[in-house]
Amino acid sequence: MKIVLAYSGGLDTTVAIRWLKETFNADVITVTVDVGQKDNFEDIEKRAYIAGATKHYTIDAKKEFADNFISYAIKMNALYEDVYPLSTALARPLIAQKVVEIAKKEKVDYIAHGSTSKGNDQVRFDLAVKALYPEAKIIAPARIWNMTREKEIEFAKARGIPIKTESSKYSIDENLWGRSIEGDDISDPSKEVPEDAFEWTKKKNNGKITLSIEFEKGIPVAINNEKMDLVKIIQVLNEVVGSYGFGRVEHLENRVVGFKSREVYEVPAALVLINSHKDLEKTVYSPLEFRFKKYIDSQWADLVYQGLWFEPLRETIQLAGDNLNKWVTGEVKIEIEGNGMRTLGRASKYSPFSEKVASYNKGWYPTDEMARGFIEIYGMHSLLTRQVRE
């Protein structure tokens, strides 16, 4: 029997290697997907083999993550419950996709992951595997063994598996698009998040910084007139604006699995790019397009958060988003100060803004007759309804 395991290199999945090997008498093939996390992948590979893996794959998927997942999160202004840019949720279907590719390559129909029965990730991972490889059988050791962190450490020590036993106050999930922070010290939503929980947004620079972000068809292509690919743009923004203390998100999140959870994220680049993109959309869209886009944006974000990346509706909504983003070309100038961002200006060749029409000092004015006629017809629904109810 062979099992392909999505392997992060952390305690849970390291213990899972040996547990799967012993429980199922299986050969375990581990797959680590690089989606921009700041890990030492050579160390992760060594750890996998020490724990008992028979084969290990490290897959660099940063560009694919940016081009095929993050790009759509930007175009769809993806903020779950108006605040969370879906950093973890976006990465899960890609990781599952890469694990499935290895499983098919190795002719293995057992796939394992380290998600618990309490988290959203189990839903995202299981549904992605079911969509891409319906014949596969999914094993989630953490849903079966019910081991605490202490028991996992004991399990590893008893088998000679080297584990860093110093307790960390926080559980971190990191990728190109963001850093999520969990732990007992921040689980109480009535208490302030301790400063030591943050890494990307530790304030190193005081004052403010001004940046210009250039977009082509909804995709960011340059910072301060310097062209870069999307991976580089995200990396630069995370480092630069994060150093001013910008990019922190804290909210009480409605999880897929049925309860509320206090969630904390560091997402500097995501917030800069999504908010700049939203501003440029408002610049170029008609009012009807703008209202419609706001609606489908929220639907897209909900589907992705809920683990439904392979839901046909997500693809349909995305097609509409692509069509609307054809006009989202231009530049947005922003200012970052602390955890605040404001727009200084924006410009696009597709903006229907007309100074001649909008200016109060010169140009076009409707006549009194035109204004009266417009107001009469515009307010008719409201006035007639009010009259019959009085």
Swiss-Prot record:
Name this protein carries in UniProt: Argininosuccinate synthase
Q: Which NCBIfam families match?
A: argG (TIGR00032), PRK00509.1 (NF001770)
Residues holding L-citrulline = 84, 120, 124, 171, 180, 253, 265
Subunit-structure text: Homotetramer.
Q: What domain of life does the UniProt record list for this protein's source?
A: Archaea
- EC number per UniProt: 6.3.4.5
**An individual GO BP term:** urea cycle
Q: What is its main location?
A: cytoplasm
**Gene3D superfamilies the UniProt entry points to:** Argininosuccinate synthetase, chain A, domain 2, HUPs
Q: Which GO terms describe its molecular function?
A: argininosuccinate synthase activity; ATP binding
Please name the taxonomic classification of the source.
Answer: Archaea, Thermoproteota, Thermoprotei, Sulfolobales, Sulfolobaceae
For this record, the Gene Ontology CC terms, alphabetical, are: cytoplasm
Query: Which Pfam families does the record match to this protein?
Result: Arginosuc_syn_C, Arginosuc_synth
* Family, per entry: Belongs to the argininosuccinate synthase family. Type 1 subfamily.
Catalytic activity from the UniProt record: L-citrulline + L-aspartate + ATP = 2-(N(omega)-L-arginino)succinate + AMP + diphosphate + H(+)
Pathway connected to this protein? Amino-acid biosynthesis; L-arginine biosynthesis; L-arginine from L-ornithine and carbamoyl phosphate: step 2/3
Point out the gene that encodes the protein.
argG
Q: Where does ATP bind?
A: 6-14, 114
EC category name: ligase
Return the InterPro entries for the record: Arginosuc_syn_C, Arginosuc_syn_N, Arginosuc_synth, Arginosuc_synth_CS, Arginosuc_synth_type_1_subfam, AS_cat/multimer_dom_body, Rossmann-like_a/b/a_fold
Quote the record's binding site residues for L-aspartate. Answer: 116, 120-121
